UniProtKB/Swiss-Prot annotation:
It comes from the Bacteria. GO terms for molecular function: asparaginyl-tRNA synthase (glutamine-hydrolyzing) activity; ATP binding; glutaminyl-tRNA synthase (glutamine-hydrolyzing) activity. This is Aspartyl/glutamyl-tRNA(Asn/Gln) amidotransferase subunit C. The gene is gatC. Belongs to the GatC family. Keywords: ATP-binding, Ligase, Nucleotide-binding, Protein biosynthesis. Its EC number is 6.3.5.-. InterPro entries: Asp/Glu-ADT_sf_sub_c, GatC. It comes from Rhizobium leguminosarum bv. trifolii (strain WSM2304). Allows the formation of correctly charged Asn-tRNA(Asn) or Gln-tRNA(Gln) through the transamidation of misacylated Asp-tRNA(Asn) or Glu-tRNA(Gln) in organisms which lack either or both of asparaginyl-tRNA or glutaminyl-tRNA synthetases. The reaction takes place in the presence of glutamine and ATP through an activated phospho-Asp-tRNA(Asn) or phospho-Glu-tRNA(Gln). Pfam families: GatC. HAMAP family: GatC (MF_00122).
Length: 95
């Protein structure tokens, strides 16, 4: 896969980024270099390689999953103009 000047300009337009002609030409080379590196990575044989989440072996800290109300409901609605039993009240918008 390769990137051409039209693709760079299209992506810049979609991202709403102003890119000069010189910058766009430079980006063509940079993006093609990145894509070439990604293609090299996809060619590496990783069969038998164990997936890892860190470069150093460590156990993830876990906590028990407990359902709570968070004890913050009153704080959350404290600045709301109108509430009812810790719920925000808003004007009806759909009939």
């Amino acid at each position: 896969m390769s990137v051409d000047l039209a693709t760079v300009k299209r992506v810049a337009h979609l991202a709403r980024i102003a890119v000069s002609e010189d910058e766009a030409n430079r980006m063509v080379g940079e993006l093609n270099g990145i894509l070439g590196f990604v293609e090299q990575l996809s060619e590496v044989n990783v069969d038998g390689v164990e997936a890892m989440t860190s470069v150093t072996p460590m156990a993830m800290k876990k906590r028990t999953d407990e359902v709570t109300d968070g004890s913050k409901a009153a704080d959350i609605v404290a600045n709301a103009p109108v509430t009812d039993h810790n719920f925000f009240l808003v004007p009806k918008v759909v009939e």
